[in-house]
Amino acid sequence: MRNPPALKAIIAVDATDDLYQDDVHFMDGVLHVDSWEMSQDLDNARPGAPDYRIDEANFRDRFDTRPWMMTYKRQQRDGPFWDRTALKKRYDSLRVPSFHIGGWYDGYRDSIPRILENVKAPVKAMIGPWSHAFPHDPYPEPGMEWRHEAVRWFDHWLKGRDTGILDEPRFAVFVRNWHPPGPYLEGVEGEWRWEEGWPIPRIRDRALYPGPNHALSDEAPEASAHRLRYVPSSGVEAGGPVMWWGDVAHDQRPTDAYSLVYDTEPLAEDLEILGLPKALLNVSADAPRANWFVRLSDVAPDGTVTQVAGAGFNGTHRESAREPKDIEPGVPFPLQIEMHFTSWVFSRGHRIRFAVSNAQWPMMWPTPYLMTTTLHLGGGTRVLLPTVPFEKRRRPEFQPPEPGPRLPGFERLEEETPSGYGEVSSIERNPRTGAAKVVATNQGGVRHPWGTERYRETITHETNDKNPAETSMRGSHRMVVELEGRTLVWEGELLFRSDLEEFFYTYTRRLLENGALVREKTWSDTIPRDFQ
């Protein structure tokens, strides 16, 4: 942080403090590819509204510039490239008062407890039951009028007004109750609660141990082992429709079928967790590269399984994400996997489920070798749940969302998906050949006073359970701007694929005006796999 003197206060919505582990490039240290890079690329390539001036300056400064994702895809391990913008490496550098807002169904939420705990400057935070959206226009419901809180925050720091915002506890958290699995929900049951900050002193870790009979209990079992065959195309449901750790995920049973699964007995009373659950595992693999994925879920009495938390781990990062090392086949080693920030109340009569797998495709790029992994039970393999004993706490009195201002000539056109991003629309599998295909789509648009802007995107992921090294993602993104007497089209086409040793990147940018091709440029690169 540069902390310029004129910067008096910050509000960060859906932010991260770690661009390597906790962003959309290498989630949990594992390669992730989605449609976002194409939409962002075309936004960067085109000139600004309302003139959309197409000239040599635009070509030089925007359209002809090398796609920045080509640089990112070469940075496959943590290190200096990511350190430049990682607040997590230097919390003391943030000296400006900051207000952090996140959502339980957004991929950017882990920074909230870390910043509350580590930043010395004034910090306030809230996290609610919404996705990657502003809280006044949330999905899912309920929302709240965060703009009122923003005015209170800025009035205090910019105008010196006594708004009372610093008299309140620092952390407002929405505690989630059970809901059925997604992918689409009208709303989430729960309640708001004030907490003084983070960590919360009354939270206690409860250890649960996977057992040889696939039970999850308070008692550590004798030593034994469970083996799991790697199915590279599994995990679609665990990744959710947008394919990241921020979705209302599907019923977890299809992914659980390819996982090691451990369940508690039905709970005798409600159990609340709040924090970052941890999985401490002793594992081994018979291949030099393997990823592990852990998920915590709620099994309802009717058998449906709702994902509560999860995380992935690149096994070659077991000692360091900066200096990865191949796995020594057959040799057990410990993993500590911190799941992503969560809140949940497991209801009486429900079961807690812990699942371990080696694939979460297409959210995470598959490792290239066929293999079998082993989970060694006993000897410290366990799950730590951050449990919260009941304590009567004050509740925030947030205002309900208010209608936003209606700007003349501005209208958001209907989007295909609730998230506004490409979501899984079809899944195809061929058991005979091992081939699998997942297609994600979205479309929408905005009407402006100067014209109409529309977009359409399609992303096709393919892999093969018999040869996961040969995995690919093919995407297309099309933006159309309709002006009076003029139609502009920007197109981006990406083919990203892998073999055992390398990634292959080909990207084409295209501009058309009134149906005629104005400019087209293609970039290609061959990138060594760096422990991915």
PLM regions and their residue ranges:
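C-terminal, loop-rich substrate-recognition/catalytic regions characterized by aromatic stacking residues
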Residues: 126, 134-136, 140-512, 516-532
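Short secondary-structure boundary/capping segments
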Residues: 2-7, 25-31, 114-119, 140-145, ...
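Glycine/Thr-rich phosphate-binding loops of Rossmann-like dinucleotide-binding domains
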Residues: 20, 108-109, 362
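Catalytic cores of eukaryotic secretory-pathway lumenal/extracellular enzymes that build
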Residues: 6-9, 119-140
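Accessory cap/linker subdomain of secreted extracellular hydrolases
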Residues: 2-93
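Serine-hydrolase catalytic core
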Residues: 67-127
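Extracellular/periplasmic catalytic domains that process cell-envelope and extracellular macromolecules
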Residues: 3, 92-94, 119, 199-202
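Acidic beta-to-alpha connecting loop that harbors the catalytic carboxylate
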Residues: 104-105, 130-131, 359
